[in-house]
Amino acid sequence: QVEGVVTLSQEDNGPTTVKVRLTGLTPGKHGFHLHEFGDTTNGCMSTGSHFNPKKLTHGAPEDDVRHAGDLGNIVAGSDGVAEATIVDNQIPLSGPDSVIGRALVVHELEDDLGKGGHELSLTTGNAGGRLACGVVGLTPI
């Protein structure tokens, strides 16, 4: 079972820092995305598509053309643990494109970052099924 904690923080209008620690993953790369809905009534399937307010195609976190929710891959070691710190400018915690109330999803496969040539590369990165998800909420600091 995949479980863990992901913490998002942002100072003023700066980038958002995402700290990830997940356990129970298969070793290797796993797509990690912010999805549009914080709805887990049907498990992770009801979180919708990648958060994409600019209506662009899927890409890598460093690409100009990408979904705002495209956070790339996290890497699990042989122990199934993935730890990462992601700093991103497209997932603010306030304003019209705030990600609070949306969902983070870890996928079963590696995200090809839109460059794999698969029919799903430009929409999902061909990252496979949804292993685990959580809604971005507010907690005291």
UniProtKB/Swiss-Prot annotation:
It is found in: Plastid, Chloroplast. Keywords: Antioxidant, Chloroplast, Copper, Disulfide bond, Metal-binding, Oxidoreductase, Plastid, Zinc. It is an enzyme of class 1 (oxidoreductase). Destroys radicals which are normally produced within the cells and which are toxic to biological systems. Its EC number is 1.15.1.1. It catalyses: 2 superoxide + 2 H(+) = H2O2 + O2. Homotetramer. PANTHER family: SUPEROXIDE DISMUTASE CU-ZN -RELATED (PTHR10003). One of its GO terms (cellular component) is chloroplast. InterPro entries: SOD-like_Cu/Zn_dom_sf (IPR036423), SOD_Cu/Zn_/chaperone (IPR024134), SOD_Cu/Zn_BS (IPR018152), SOD_Cu_Zn_dom (IPR001424). Its cofactor is Cu cation; Zn(2+). Cu cation binds at residues 33, 35, 50, 107. Its main location: plastid. Zn(2+) binds at residues 50, 58, 67, 70. One of its GO terms (molecular function) is superoxide dismutase activity. Belongs to the Cu-Zn superoxide dismutase family. It comes from Pinus sylvestris. This is Superoxide dismutase [Cu-Zn], chloroplastic. Disulfide bonds join 44-133. Binds 1 copper ion per subunit. Binds 1 zinc ion per subunit. It comes from the Eukaryota.
